[in-house]
Amino acid sequence: MDNSSTLIDENTPLVQNKQERQESFRDLKGHVKALLAAFYMAMIAGLNDGTLGSIIPRVKQYYDITNETISLLFLCSATGFFISAGFNGFIVHHIGQLKAIYLGGTVQLAAYFVLMMGFPFPVMASAMVCSGMGMALMDAAMNVFTANLPLATLMLNILHALYGVGAMISPLVATYLLEHDISWKGMYIFLAVCSIINLITVTVGFMGVKLDEEHDEDNTDNQQSRKALTKAAILHPMTIIGALYILIYVGDEVVVGGWGYTYLTEGRHGDPIAMGRVISAYWAGLASGRILLGYLAGKFGEKLMITVFTMMIIGCLTVMCISADVVLNSSVIISIGLLLGPMFPTTISLASKVLPRSYHTTAIGFISALGAGGAALFPFITGMISGKFGILSMPYACIIMTLGMLVLWAMIPSDKPFFGYFQKNK
């Protein structure tokens, strides 16, 4: 076996799947309702992550605060993500995956009700902790469920493309509110309505679906207690490296999509309405990249293509550092969205192949929940940096994050040689 796959042995699904028949869309029959519910959860996640960045200027004005202070909202959200990441396996094993989804959705909805009221800033910050906790539980669940379906790689690409669609919609709604002089609180009213629909789709979609069926089988097969299984899953190298990679990746993604609006309007003096549409186009690029570039990554090899895309992102960020032209910066930001697209679903797909199936709920849930915390942690750090050095420091911070991604990606195991496509077609 190739040296890049040293963490994979003959007993992992990665090797076993090579001998199985080709999967088809017929294999998804019976999963359609649940899959649609998971897709909608992904859109909710995107709506959530795309919201705060698009309303930062108005929230700053409402509370009369600085970039450093408002960045605390990202930190509070990250705290909620990390709490859920630490307890996700425990919660799922004790109340089941479906109840964990309901718990996450209910906590998320409660947070939106608080946020729409415009309470004092400390209350808003506390609500962001709850929002992060709820979102992390749902994020982990939708990734675990989808990663174990037939055609998992394609379904994950669609799942995360819909995340991008959700994140694209948020700036459009925020821009509409700005154009019609409606308070930023309207964004959270909109999110609360979407969250109510989410609880309905979960109820209908997962009705009769045995999400926890595999746990009993896996525990019997592996002769391990749940505690030992959870520990082994989290300490697996794929889990640790994958979680760190996704942590930085999601941070990079949301820093550009979140602080990008402030960067373009305050740093490059772009028109607020037009720049809101640019950020929507960034998220649309992300959604498109997850399908189009995800296909290229699968065809030519994930390790090679993701490395190429990452290096191209570094080039784009360098252009942002040296050019003050708002049109060029806008174009580059949209391009970054396209290039970032396939990275999350590709990592989750590789994890589902490398890890034993008994690890999937805990390991993929941990990768997703901890990694999604990057959507709050790194925007917080970037906000602190921009408060000290100015918003034009944002692309420099993103370059550092992207270099970290490049190093971690080189450490992630793969089922193909680095130049697998070219070796195969010699």
Segments predicted by a language model, with ranges:
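Extracytoplasmic gate region of multi-pass secondary transporters
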Residues: 52-53, 235-288
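Helix-to-loop junctions at the C-terminal end of transmembrane segments
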Residues: 84-97, 289-302, 386
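Cytosolic juxtamembrane N-terminal segment immediately preceding the first transmembrane helix
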Residues: 1-41, 45, 230-232
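Helix-breaking motifs and short loop linkers at transmembrane-helix boundaries and internal kinks
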Residues: 64, 96, 117-122, 269, ...
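Intracellular juxtamembrane helix-capping segments at the cytosolic ends
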Residues: 136-150, 342-356
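Helix-loop-helix hairpin linking two adjacent transmembrane segments in secondary transporters
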Residues: 152, 158-213
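Conserved MFS/SLC helix-loop-helix module at the cytosolic interface between two early adjacent transmembrane helices
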Residues: 83-122
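C-terminal transmembrane helical hairpin of 12-TM major facilitator-type secondary transporters
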Residues: 300-347
